[in-house]
Amino acid sequence: MWVLTPAAFAEKLLSVFRQPLSSLWRSLVPLFCWLRATFWLLATKRTKQQLVLREPDETKEEEEDPPLPATPTSVNYHFTRQCNYKCGFCFHTAKTSFVLPLEEAKRGLLLLKEAGMEKINFSGGEPFLQDRGEYLGKLVKFCKVELRLPSVSIVSNGSLIRERWFQNYGEYLDILAISCDSFDEEVNVLIGRGQGKKNHVENLQKLRTWCRDYRVAFKINSVINRFNVEEDMTEQIKALNPIRWKVFQCLLIEGENCGEDALREAERFVIDDEEFERSLERHKEVSCLVPESNQKMKDSYLILDEYMRFLNCRKGRKEPSKSILDVGVEEAIKFSGFDEKMFLKRGGKYIWSKADLKLDW
């Protein structure tokens, strides 16, 4: 098929009017063909342009598939909020006295294992407060024997632990972390870790011995705050020789240790980033030191509360998900605010099974 240019079309049109009417139809036939071809070409061009514009959108839709839910590799289960200490900066305070029935807690732990959990850390409150440590011991044994978790750990203030507990449950526990913010007993009293006639530091040394005797890896957690920020703990930490010394910057959580609904007023304990860095510099010779600033700490932990709800701390306060017992792990973890990249960046995954630590007991 041939196509006329606009100039040729005008010339042809003039020639039509010069011809007799008898030949008019023969002259118009090529014009109709030209018009038809022209409109067809325009329509084809427009369709191609629309396809080109649409392709990136379709690609974008394919790229914007919803992300897969996070895997609960390491979970911190605060099964109780009750505590026998009154640490001024505590960010998980005794707002309820609820503790799940043992079998319900086990059901939730099984759900977590099925979702990919490798490490469980029991915390509080003070976890040894419930049933004098028996509730905790049964959960520890369940996780190691029945769930076969690579790592089972506890964070405690250490004041209620007895040697009998190690005799009954020590073999099932990988790591015991004891909170110790100062080796000056007067500072411990100021912070709220006073034990009356007991000495927190002396008790820490006794627990270190029990951990060695019963083959439990020993760890120390310290919160750097206004009252201990100038203290040098290098020699004491080296003498105790923990596998890890976790050093946290004092953190404010609205509704827990600051704000109208809080049970603590932690503002007086807060230090700035520069002060925290100076404290870390002072302890740089401690090889087991693992620092955690507020930035690293806030969103890099998967925290379950006493109802087995994930707690989202992204907005500076704890916003609970629905319980994993009601909606399952995959649905609840979507609302956890968990930053998996920061978890890995802060060294959240490490050698955490005592079988792999190869310790010289």
Curated annotation (Swiss-Prot):
Main location: endoplasmic reticulum
Keyword Signal among record annotations: no
Membrane topology: Peripheral membrane protein
Transmembrane segments: none
UniProt cross-references to InterPro entries, sorted A to Z: Aldolase_TIM (IPR013785), Elp3/MiaA/NifB-like_rSAM (IPR006638), RSAD2 (IPR026372), RSAD2/Viperin_antiviral (IPR051196), rSAM (IPR007197)
SS bond partners: none
Molecular function GO terms recorded: 4 iron, 4 sulfur cluster binding; lyase activity; metal ion binding
SUPFAM superfamilies: Radical SAM enzymes
Assembly and oligomerization: Homodimer. Interacts with IRAK1 and TRAF6. Interacts with FPPS. Interacts with HADHB. Interacts (via C-terminus) with VAPA/VAP33 (via C-terminus).
Job of this protein: Interferon-inducible antiviral protein which plays a major role in the cell antiviral state induced by type I and type II interferon. Catalyzes the conversion of cytidine triphosphate (CTP) to 3'-deoxy-3',4'-didehydro-CTP (ddhCTP) via a SAM-dependent radical mechanism. In turn, ddhCTP acts as a chain terminator for the RNA-dependent RNA polymerases from multiple viruses and directly inhibits viral replication. Therefore, inhibits a wide range of DNA and RNA viruses.
Name assigned to this protein: S-adenosylmethionine-dependent nucleotide dehydratase RSAD2
Species of origin: Pongo abelii (Sumatran orangutan)
